[in-house]
Design a protein with these regions (language model features):
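Long alpha-helical solenoid repeat scaffolds
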Residues: 1, 39, 43-46
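Ser/Pro/Thr-rich intrinsically disordered low-complexity regulatory tracts in nuclear proteins
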Residues: 10, 17-21
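Glycine-centered motif in EGF-like
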Residues: 23-34, 39, 50-207, 224-279
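Short beta-strand micro-motifs enriched in acidic
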Residues: 219-223
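Extended amphipathic alpha-helical coiled-coil/heptad-repeat regions
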Residues: 1-11
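Glycine-centered tight beta-turn/hairpin loop motif at sheet-sheet or coil-to-beta transitions
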Residues: 209-213
Length: 280
């Protein structure tokens, strides 16, 4: 019997006492107070739980975070500290935060930084990347419902500039890895073909029917995952138009809040059966 995976109550309880800007003046906040550090490191432990989990377990973790409404206080505090809410978002190149640092926060290296404030900035930046990577739907919902237009615009531009390409590259690497692990079918058993274009941020999925390929393309926008991927028809063979359009609409809806895997179970076309895609 399968039991839903969960994050420990003790760890989740540490996410309840979220800091706010009202609690600290600028001078104290720059010192990276212990309470703030503990709260942010608790989030880091939460995302560590995602890193080695299966897609099904990640889905359970995401539901816990969303149902508990934990993400809003984190992101509100994050974008206050990093300047997005004041239309003065942190410039990562000036802060000396490169792509490797965005992807990974190193506590030992952080201790050697010239200021506690830069340590805090690095951890916040890494947490935002991990949020986009592991709970993109929850982050996106926060962004869509953000009441401050200035913050919303700033966050989208900042995400596009520094984070989206990294998240997309991670996703496309996952798709390539998944595709490479699929068994090749026999001559009588057709299999789904996957082609990835990293430069154009596209995934092509196709199935051969009568020596022709029926295929779709999934295009990832410049501010992904805040903006959704687009599913478009490339070539339709042997499938009625109405059924094909239903499939495209289904797939578009299924990936609206998805980032980890575009295709995980082998999917197929046939003249009398719909093209079945499972997205996690």
């Amino acid at each position: 019997m399968y039991l839903d995976a969960t994050i420990s109550e003790e760890l989740l309880s540490l996410l309840l006492d979220a800091p706010t800007m009202d609690q600290y003046d600028d001078a104290n906040l720059e010192l990276f107070p212990i309470a703030v550090r503990g709260y942010l490191l608790s989030w880091h432990l939460v995302f560590d739980s995602f890193s080695s989990a299966s897609s099904r377990v990640r889905s359970n973790y995401s539901a816990l975070i969303e149902d508990g409404k934990y993400i809003e206080p984190l992101l509100n505090f994050m974008f206050d500290v990093l300047g997005n809410s004041a239309a003065s978002a942190l410039k990562l190149e000036k802060e000396g935060i490169n792509d490797a640092m965005i992807r990974k926060y190193d506590m030992s290296a952080a201790m050697n930084l010239e200021s506690s404030e830069r340590d805090m900035h690095w951890l916040l930046v890494n947490l935002y990347y991990l949020g986009l990577k592991y709970i993109p739907g929850t982050v996106k919902k926060w962004w869509l419902t953000c009441k401050d237009r200035q913050t919303s615009i700033s966050v989208e531009a900042w995400t596009e500039k520094y984070f989206s390409n990294l998240v997309v590259q991670d996703l496309l690497d996952d798709v390539i890895q998944w595709s490479d692990t699929q068994e090749t079918g026999s001559e009588d058993e057709k299999t789904l073909s996957i082609r990835v274009s990293k430069n154009s941020r596209e995934v092509f999925a196709g199935y051969e029917i009568d020596e022709m390929e029926t295929s779709v393309v999934i295009r990832l926008p410049s501010s992904y995952p805040l903006k959704i991927a687009a599913v478009e028809s490339v070539n339709r063979v042997g499938i009625p138009e109405a059924k094909w359009q239903n499939f495209l609409r289904y797939t578009q809806g299924a990936i609206q809040f998805t980032v980890r895997c575009i295709l995980e179970n082998q999917s197929h076309f046939s003249t009398d059966q719909y093209f079945r895609t499972v997205l996690l």
